[in-house]
Amino acid sequence: MMRRVSLLFWLLVATLGFTACVRTTEQPVSTPPTQPTATLAPLSPAFLPTSTLPVPTPRAQPERMGTFFFYWYHCPERACDASELTAIPPGWLTPLPDDPDPRDGLAYSSINYDWFEGELRDLVDVGFDLILPVSWGDHPHPWFRQDRLDLLVQANGILEKPLPIGMFLDTTAQQAMYNDFVADGYRFGPTIPRMPLSDARSGYFFYDLHIKGFFERIPREMWATEQGRPIIVTYTALCCDELYRAGELWRAVKEAFRADFGVEPWLILEETWFTPEALAPGEGLQPLELVADGRYHWGTALHGPQTATLRNFSVTSVGPGFDNRSIVGITDPRLQPREAPPGGGPPSNGAFFRASLAAVPPATDLLLIETWNEWPESTGIARASHQGVDGQPLPDDFYMDLLRRWRRGG
């Protein structure tokens, strides 16, 4: 049941000048989707890689490196269709190697403690400085709800040096939550109505139902921070309409966070939030650039490396390639082969990722790898059974090792 009074609801009512009543009746039960829809890259590439591979040169390393970590899997029962994958990770079809405890399963699953621990150890070994677990709030699927973060925290806590944890706020969830709220069911996608930011309740779906619960489950000593402020990275603005109010929305979110946690978050928004109307919203409304702390590009696993800078804070994102053609029901199949050099030329193992890493500016404050383990879109660099250009299996840690050696300057 929705709470009668939400801090952020009344903040938004006050700041946006709207009045509305929060519905307090029990929400209708909707039929959840079979699995979360994969987060698709924006349709229009903003970057085309150069026609030749950059030549790596000695360089200063980015200040920090993080990655998007997906825990929406529950093999072998759910969200585990091998026919949608181009590379199979350990634990997907067969038990995880060296999993000592069958009581919580032996598979690639967010209910399996040993899966979390194994992933975290690999992340540390590669050289990541922080991780960004993808979050949809309390998704209808029990294996992808906020409480699954408890196992992540538990596994992280046994590491010699726990990985700092930030939030990857998948805004697809806001579209789904809003449609569920207005009695249309938990639905999302390009043909589904978007959430209007002029609705004073919009902040409730971002903060109270999502962001707040995430950070309540991550101990403060594990927060990934920038200048002492916990990091939130958002997905695209495809969830929402009326983006001229985006600055007001995110200002209210930051104020509500500060009221609950005593500090404002470091907010890194995806580039699609920065529309002309969001940047120049009109008299009396907050321009988005004055509210956000950083900006970045999603879709670099498909389109190539991108860097965005806001007030001297630079974020670069890169990925190894992209292939969503096997996803059931996909209406926009796209491909960036991993072995294809940007602009053409003889294929080689990991060519797209190598070129992307070589293009990272040395002054980057935060490098984001897209992704650690988003398998249906084939953007993961974690352990998996990739094939080489000769048709032979690559080592399951091929992409991990490629990044590890690059990070260490090799």
Please identify what each model-predicted range represents.
Residues 19-20, 409:
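A general secondary-structure boundary signal
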Residues 1-8:
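Bacterial N-terminal signal peptides that target proteins for export
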Residues 11, 15, 21-59:
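Ser/Thr-rich, Proline-interspersed low-complexity disordered segments
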Residues 5, 25-28, 374:
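Residue-level detector of intrinsically disordered/flexible regions characterized by low predicted structural confidence
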Residues 7, 30-31, 378:
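Short amphipathic alpha-helical "recognition" segments used for binding
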Residues 47-410:
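Glycan-processing catalytic domains of CAZymes
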